[in-house]
């Protein structure tokens, strides 16, 4: 099969950046999915804002601005932006959704017309996204895939420091960091002032609560931070 992925994110990246701190989960998914398709001997092309056209591990990377004459693919997959599917011809179009998108946001992001035009199936990530996404944004079909783990986390053995009193938060601050900080200040820190919470960069100084900023670093450094922590805290949805 001829398969293409389309990603409009402005950050230039390829699969060489899989362990870099400049990409997020959405880009990781694209890299890993494309790699698995290539391993199954499919002809895979990724259109994004990469600096140079190149072939890496049997996956062709092309700058998205180079698309012309609407090339044909057996399967076209958009990474979060349905409008990108306007640029290719395919009888099988798919859009990966990385969030629970309201109808209001769907219209505001100018996705609706392209959605009706391309009629893509929507890929949701896990039961929560599948259950809570508006059914009108799944009228052409949907299916879910579960979150996976990057190979570096499978291959690396973490030696836990059981004497550590550190907790760590590794997501971006828009992933309910405010909620976590509030819980820490009210319920955790008062019980033990020696416990430390390391978070992604925050716009306020919170060291009086033993909350410390940590940099967004590559995955090798992240593994080191995890090994020096007792618990990884991930606040749920409000």
Regions found by a protein language model. Give the residues of each.
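Short beta-strand segments
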Residues: 7, 46-48, 77, 146, ...
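Short loop/turn segments at strand-loop or loop-helix junctions that form parts
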Residues: 5-11, 97-100, 147, 199-204, ...
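Acidic donor-binding loop of glycosyltransferase active sites
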Residues: 227-238
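A short, active-site helix/loop in glycosyltransferases that binds the activated sugar's phosphate group
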Residues: 104-106, 118-143, 149
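Conserved catalytic-core segment of nucleotide-activated headgroup transferases in glycan assembly
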Residues: 151-223
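N-terminal subdomain of nucleotide-sugar transferases
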Residues: 1-48
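Extended catalytic core of nucleotide-activated donor transferases of GT-like folds
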Residues: 45-120, 127-128
């Amino acid at each position: 099969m001829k398969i293409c992925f389309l990603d409009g994110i402005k950050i230039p990246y390829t699969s060489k950046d899989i362990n870099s701190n400049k990409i997020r989960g959405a880009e990781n998914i694209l890299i890993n999915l494309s790699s698995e398709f290539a391993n199954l001997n499919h002809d895979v092309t990724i259109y994004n804002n990469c600096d140079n056209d190149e072939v890496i591990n049997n996956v062709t990377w092309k700058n998205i601005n180079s698309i012309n004459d609407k090339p044909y693919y057996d399967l076209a997959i958009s990474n979060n932006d349905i409008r990108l599917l306007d640029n290719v011809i395919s009888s099988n179009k798919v859009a990966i959704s990385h969030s629970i998108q309201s109808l209001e946001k769907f219209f505001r992001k100018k996705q609706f017309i392209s959605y009706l035009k391309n009629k893509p199936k929507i890929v949701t990530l896990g039961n929560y996204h599948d259950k809570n996404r508006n059914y009108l944004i799944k009228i052409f079909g949907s299916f879910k895939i579960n979150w996976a783990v990057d190979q570096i986390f499978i291959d690396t053995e973490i030696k836990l420091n059981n004497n550590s009193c550190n907790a760590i938060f590794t997501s971006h601050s828009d992933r309910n960091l405010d909620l976590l900080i509030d819980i820490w200040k009210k319920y955790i820190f008062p019980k033990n002032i020696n416990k430390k919470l390391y978070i992604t960069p925050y716009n306020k100084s919170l060291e009086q609560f033993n909350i410390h900023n940590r940099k967004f670093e590559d995955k090798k450094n992240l593994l080191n931070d995890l090994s020096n922590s007792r618990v990884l805290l991930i606040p749920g949805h409000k």
